[in-house]
């Protein structure tokens, strides 16, 4: 994670600290007791709204610690598509209160959290990076696990992650084995948008592989194998719709796919995060069209 991303997360938590329960003519409840300015909330991207929602739940409780996806967004860690607003938390002791005392849309997990695994920033408590990664295998989805692995391997060596998993206590062995296999087997992608697209495709058992337009700097399109040397290319636009990041000319990925004569599915990152089902529907249509085309005699193409 770069300095700009770290500064953005710190600034967002500081903004929430100022906004929380400040007098407002148009408040928006992020928890049952915490409000922010509605216009400010609506201006935030969905992942930032998740950070604010988790921060509100942590503030409302004297001891609750954010877990899994909700701790991941506090770190800027990559996660799978949005699921719901139910926040996962735990108490340090691991003993949840009676369900009648749970705040609205909050789920207490029966897992202890040590002091050395807890980070506190602006009165927000959440687990550290490596503990968060393990919790994604306990409570997260396969897309959470795949994208978080890409992110984690850009911050830690494989050996460091394997050693942490080996030393982790209080978790079922099969969960730790799954984490080991994923860390060992993933080729990390350097961009969240392509990491997320690959994770969504993999969760639907669709094989794909990345093209690196420049080694170790940025990934090109994802290539989906339709069988028999037939392929389609996936291009995910960033938040600005531009393809010129990392110093590449505008639309380099589209030029690459055009040069290789691949049919292309182009999708927006924010839509992929919020509605992956629509993305998969479009990929399915493109695959079927390619397979149908190649089932015809060549003079009918």
What kind of feature is each model-predicted range?
Residues 1-171, 288-301:
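Short gly/ser-rich loop at a beta-strand->alpha-helix junction or flexible surface loop bordering the NTP-binding
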